[in-house]
C-alpha cells in the first residue's frame, strides 16, 4: 500500500478532543493520549492530558494517504500503557475515501463513537477529529516542536508520548472537578466538560463546539448560550453542576430549571411551564416524610411551654389519645395507708408524704383516683386502652410534680424545664399509642428549647420592608443592617405597595418566598445535592462572588431568625449539613447525599483488597475555576500510599475533605450568623433529623388531621358546604393542597406535630372556616388568623371552581 501513497503529505489530521471516556479505576482518572496510524506505517502520538475523561488536544498531523487508506486512532491511558491492556480506552477506524474527496479537496469535521478492541473491554465516549486537504497553513505542532512521527509496523512497540505539564503524583478523587462555569462571575462561562460517571449524560463538550465551528483546529469553545440543539432563547444560559448535570439559567426571571427551553420560545408558555415545574418539584419535596410519621393526629396535645411552673395548662384535649382523671370514688377519710403522712404547706394546702418511696403528692391516697386513657379503634370510635389507680403508678420522676386544676383535673409540672403537661410522665403508654419515640422526644426537647431565656422575644418591634420582586437583595440589606438584639424583637414584615399589618401571616409569607430565592442555584451559593434535585448543599465554588461569605452569614441569620420567631423555611438540606450545624462528625454514610459515586467507591475500598489494584495516595485532586491542584489529606499525603492497613483512615479523611473542608469558610460564616440568634448549646439538644424538622416543619399534608383540628363559625361540620369543601380538598393533588394551605395560612408548611399546633398571631390558633361572603364572590383568607371566609356555595362544582381560582390566582396577601 505504501507504494501507492504520494511522496508528500496530502491530508492534515487534527485530533481535537475526546468526550466522556470510560473511567476504569475506582478513584483515579485516566491520563489519555491518542495514537493515529495509517496502514500500520505512519504513526503519530498526541501529548498526554492528565487526569480527565474529556481530554482536549487540538494537535495537527500531516499524513500521506490515498482513498483506500485506513486511519486508525486509538486512545490509551498513559499510566497503564505498559500493562497488558495498555490502558485501552477506545478506537475509531476511518476509510479516507468514505469521508473526503482527495482530488476535489475539502474539509470535514467528524465526531465518531469510540469502539471496542478485540479484547472486548468496555469503552465509552466520542472522538472529534478534523480532516483537511488544505496544508497551506503552518502545522502548529511542528512549529512548537511537538510533532512526533514513527515509522513502524505496530502501535504497541513502546510509544512514549510527551506528557503535558501537570502533577505527576497519583491522587484520589471519586468525583470530577466542579465545572467552573457554574460560578463564573461574568455569567457567561465557557464549559469545561467534566463528569464523574462512566456514561456522559451532559451536552457535548467544548471540544464538540470547536468541532462544529472551526475547520482548522483552532480552539473555539461551544458558548454557554448554545448547545447541541442550537442557540438558546434570549436571556438563557446553559450551565453544568459539579456532577455533570446540565441545567439552564433564565436571566430574565433569575430562575433555574433542568428542562431545556424550547426553540419556539414563548415567554407566557415558558412562565407557565416554569410554574408547573416548580409545583412538581414542590410536590416531590413535600412527599419527603418519614414512613412512620403519619400519626401526628394521634400524638397528645401538650400545651405551649409556660414561663412559670405554677401555671396550669388551659383548655381541653381534643386528641385521639387523651388522659382524663376522674373525681374521687371513695371518701378521703379513715387512716392513711402504712408509711404515709399528711402535711400542710405554709399556704395551708395539704399534701401527702409517702415514706416508703420518699416522695410527695397532692393526691390523697385514700381517694382512689383512676387514670383512663382513650384511643381509637379501627372504626374510629373511642375505646378504653388502659385504666389503673394512681397509687399503683409509683413515684414521679425527679423534678416532676402533680397538681389539680379547679375542676379536679390532674396536670403535671416539670420543674426541670419549667413546663406543664396533661401527660403523666409515669405513663409512657399514653404517648406510645401509635406515636414514634423520636416524636415524643422531639416534642419535649422543643418545649425545653423554646422555654429558654435566649429564645424569648424581646420588647419592641423589628420592622423589615421588602419588595416581592427583589426580596433577596432587600432582605439582605434590611437584616444585615440590624443588630442581633433588634432581630429578636417582634418581627413586623411589610411588603412594598401592599396594605396590611403583620400578625404572623406576612412573616410566614416572607420566609416562604425568601427561602425559595436565597437557596436558588442561580446565585451560586447553594447547589442541588447528588441525592436528588431539591435537597441543597453549599456550593464549594461560591467564591465566584467576592461577597459570598457575607451572604452566608446573612443566610445563617435568616435560618436563625425563622427558628427564633417560630417560622418555617421551604427548603431542605443534605443530612450532613444538619450534622455540621450540630458540630457532629460526618461519616461515610453522609457521603451518599453529597457524591453517590464517591460513596460507592469508598465503600468498595473498605470492603475489598486494594493491594495492587488501586494506586492511591493520601491526596485528592480539586479544580477551581479551571485550575487543578493536588491537596494533601495529611502532611506529605501525596507521597503516602494507601494500603489495606491505612485505608480506613484514608476513607475518613476523604469524607471529611469532601463534605466539610471544601466549604469550611462558607459554613463558618453561615454559623456565625445563625448563632447570633440561636445559641449553639441550645440547638445541640436536637439531633440532625429533629433539626431538619425544626427548620422546615413536616412536609406532608394529612387531610384527616387538618379536618380534625378545624373550627367552624356559622357552619357545622355536617353542613353540605363543609362536606363539599373537604371533598374538594381530598380530590386535589399534593401541590394544590399545599397552595390552599399557603393561601389560608401564609405558608405551605405545617408544624411538626400537625395541625393542632398551627400558630396564629397570638399563639396556637386552629384552622377556621367562617361563613362569610356572597356566593358570587371568591373565598377570602386571613393568614394571620389561619381563617378562611367561605361563602355558602350551592353546589360542589361552584365551590371547587371558586376555590381553584382563589388559590391559583391570588398573589397578594391583603390583611385586615
Curated annotation (Swiss-Prot):
- Which PROSITE patterns did the record assign? C2, HECT, WW_DOMAIN_1, WW_DOMAIN_2
Q: Which residues form the active site?
A: 784 (glycyl thioester intermediate)
Q: Which InterPro entries match?
A: C2_dom, C2_domain_sf, E3_ub_ligase_SMURF1, E3_ubiq-protein_ligase, HECT_dom, Hect_E3_ubiquitin_ligase, WW_dom, WW_dom_sf
Q: Per its record, what are the GO molecular function terms?
A: phosphatidylinositol binding; ubiquitin binding; ubiquitin-protein transferase activity; ubiquitin-ubiquitin ligase activity
Question: What are the protein's UniProt keywords?
Answer: Cytoplasm, Repeat, Transferase, Ubl conjugation pathway
Pathway assignment: Protein modification; protein ubiquitination
The main enzyme category here is transferase
Region (Disordered) residue ranges read 134-238, 254-354
- Subunit structure of this entry? Interacts with creD.
Please report which protein family the annotation says this sequence is part of. Belongs to the RSP5/NEDD4 family.
Relate the protein's function as given in its record: E3 ubiquitin-protein ligase which accepts ubiquitin from an E2 ubiquitin-conjugating enzyme in the form of a thioester and then directly transfers the ubiquitin to targeted substrates. Probably involved in the regulatory network controlling carbon source utilization.
Protein name from the UniProt record: Probable E3 ubiquitin-protein ligase hulA
Tell me the organism: Neosartorya fischeri (strain ATCC 1020 / DSM 3700 / CBS 544.65 / FGSC A1164 / JCM 1740 / NRRL 181 / WB 181) (Aspergillus fischerianus)
- List the gene name: hulA
Amino acid at each position: 500500500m505504501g507504494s501507492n501513497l504520494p511522496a508528500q503529505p496530502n491530508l492534515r489530521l487534527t485530533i481535537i478532543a475526546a468526550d466522556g471516556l470510560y473511567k476504569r479505576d475506582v478513584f483515579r482518572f485516566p491520563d489519555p493520549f491518542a495514537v493515529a496510524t495509517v496502514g500500520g506505517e505512519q504513526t503519530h502520538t498526541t501529548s498526554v492530558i492528565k487526569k480527565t475523561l474529556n481530554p482536549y488536544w487540538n494537535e495537527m498531523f500531516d499524513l500521506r494517504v490515498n482513498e483506500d487508506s485506513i486511519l486508525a486512532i486509538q486512545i490509551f491511558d498513559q499510566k497503564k500503557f505498559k500493562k497488558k491492556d495498555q490502558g485501552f480506552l477506545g478506537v475509531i477506524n476511518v476509510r479516507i475515501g468514505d469521508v473526503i474527496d482527495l482530488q476535489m479537496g475539502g474539509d470535514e469535521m467528524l465526531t465518531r463513537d469510540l469502539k471496542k478492541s478485540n479484547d472486548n473491554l468496555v469503552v465509552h465516549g466520542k472522538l472529534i477529529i478534523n480532516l483537511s486537504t488544505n496544508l497551506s497553513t503552518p502545522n502548529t505542532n511542528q512549529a512548537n516542536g511537538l510533532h512526533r512521527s514513527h515509522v513502524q509496523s505496530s502501535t504497541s512497540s513502546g510509544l512514549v508520548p510527551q506528557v503535558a505539564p501537570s502533577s505527576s503524583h497519583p491522587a484520589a478523587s471519586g468525583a470530577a472537578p466542579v465545572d467552573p462555569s457554574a460560578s463564573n462571575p461574568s455569567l457567561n462561562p465557557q464549559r469545561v466538560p467534566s463528569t464523574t460517571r462512566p456514561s456522559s449524560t451532559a451536552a457535548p463538550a467544548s471540544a464538540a463546539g470547536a468541532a462544529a465551528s472551526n475547520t482548522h483546529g483552532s480552539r473555539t469553545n461551544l458558548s454557554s448560550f448554545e448547545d447541541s440543539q442550537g442557540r438558546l432563547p434570549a436571556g438563557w444560559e446553559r450551565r453544568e453542576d459539579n456532577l455533570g448535570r446540565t441545567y439552564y439559567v433564565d436571566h430574565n426571571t433569575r430562575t433555574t430549571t433542568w428542562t431545556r427551553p424550547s426553540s419556539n420560545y414563548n415567554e407566557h408558555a415558558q412562565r407557565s411551564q416554569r410554574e408547573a415545574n416548580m409545583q412538581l418539584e414542590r410536590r416531590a419535596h413535600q412527599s419527603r416524610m418519614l414512613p412512620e410519621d403519619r400519626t401526628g393526629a394521634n400524638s397528645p396535645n401538650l400545651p405551649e411551654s409556660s414561663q412559670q411552673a405554677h401555671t396550669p395548662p388551659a383548655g381541653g384535649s381534643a386528641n385521639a389519645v387523651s388522659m382524663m382523671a376522674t373525681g374521687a370514688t371513695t371518701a378521703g377519710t379513715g387512716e392513711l395507708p402504712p408509711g404515709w403522712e399528711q402535711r400542710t404547706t405554709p399556704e395551708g394546702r395539704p399534701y401527702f408524704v409517702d415514706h416508703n418511696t420518699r416522695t410527695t403528692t397532692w393526691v390523697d391516697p385514700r381517694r382512689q383516683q383512676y387514670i383512663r386513657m382513650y384511643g381509637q379503634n379501627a372504626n374510629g370510635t373511642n375505646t378504653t386502652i388502659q385504666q389503673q389507680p394512681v397509687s399503683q403508678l409509683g413515684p414521679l420522676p425527679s423534678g416532676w410534680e402533680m397538681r389539680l386544676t379547679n375542676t379536679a383535673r390532674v396536670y403535671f409540672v416539670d420543674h426541670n424545664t419549667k413546663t406543664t403537661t396533661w401527660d403523666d410522665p409515669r405513663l409512657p403508654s399514653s404517648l406510645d399509642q401509635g406515636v414514634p419515640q423520636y416524636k415524643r422526644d422531639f416534642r419535649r426537647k422543643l418545649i425545653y428549647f423554646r422555654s429558654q431565656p435566649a429564645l424569648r422575644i424581646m420588647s419592641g418591634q423589628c420592622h423589615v420592608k421588602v419588595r416581592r420582586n427583589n426580596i433577596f437583595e432587600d432582605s439582605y440589606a434590611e437584616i444585615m443592617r440590624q443588630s442581633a438584639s433588634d432581630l429578636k424583637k417582634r418581627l413586623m414584615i411589610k411588603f412594598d405597595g401592599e396594605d396590611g399589618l403583620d400578625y404572623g401571616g406576612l412573616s410566614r409569607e416572607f420566609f416562604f418566598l425568601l427561602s425559595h430565592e436565597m437557596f436558588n442555584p442561580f446565585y451560586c451559593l447553594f447547589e442541588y445535592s447528588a441525592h436528588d434535585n431539591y435537597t441543597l448543599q453549599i456550593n464549594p465554588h461560591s467564591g465566584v462572588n467576592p461577597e459570598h461569605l457575607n451572604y452566608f452569614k446573612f443566610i445563617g441569620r435568616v435560618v436563625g431568625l425563622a427558628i427564633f420567631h417560630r417560622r418555617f423555611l421551604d427548603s431542605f438540606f443534605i443530612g450532613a449539613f444538619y450534622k455540621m450545624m450540630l458540630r457532629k462528625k460526618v461519616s461515610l454514610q453522609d457521603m451518599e447525599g453529597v457524591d453517590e459515586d464517591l460513596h460507592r467507591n469508598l465503600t468498595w475500598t473498605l470492603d475489598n483488597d486494594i493491594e495492587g489494584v488501586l494506586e492511591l495516595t493520601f491526596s485528592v485532586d480539586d479544580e477551581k475555576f479551571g485550575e487543578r491542584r493536588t491537596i494533601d489529606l495529611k502532611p506529605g499525603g501525596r507521597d503516602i500510599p494507601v494500603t489495606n492497613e491505612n485505608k480506613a483512615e484514608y476513607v475518613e479523611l476523604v469524607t471529611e475533605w469532601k463534605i466539610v473542608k471544601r466549604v469550611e469558610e462558607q459554613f463558618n460564616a453561615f454559623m456565625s450568623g445563625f448563632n447570633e440568634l440561636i445559641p449553639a448549646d441550645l440547638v445541640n439538644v436536637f439531633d440532625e433529623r429533629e433539626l431538619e424538622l425544626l427548620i422546615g416543619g413536616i412536609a406532608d399534608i394529612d387531610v384527616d388531621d387538618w379536618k380534625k383540628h378545624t373550627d367552624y363559625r356559622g357552619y357545622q361540620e355536617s353542613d353540605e358546604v363543609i362536606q363539599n369543601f373537604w371533598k374538594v380538598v381530598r380530590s386535589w393533588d399534593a401541590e394544590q393542597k399545599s397552595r390552599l394551605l399557603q393561601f389560608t395560612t401564609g405558608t405551605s408548611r405545617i408544624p411538626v406535630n400537625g395541625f393542632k399546633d398551627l400558630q396564629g398571631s397570638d399563639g396556637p390558633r386552629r384552622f377556621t372556616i367562617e361563613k362569610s361572603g356572597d356566593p358570587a364572590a371568591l373565598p377570602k383568607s386571613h393568614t394571620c388568623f389561619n381563617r378562611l371566609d367561605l361563602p355558602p356555595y350551592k353546589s360542589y362544582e361552584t365551590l371547587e371552581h371558586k376555590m381553584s381560582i382563589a388559590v391559583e390566582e391570588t398573589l397578594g396577601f391583603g390583611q385586615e
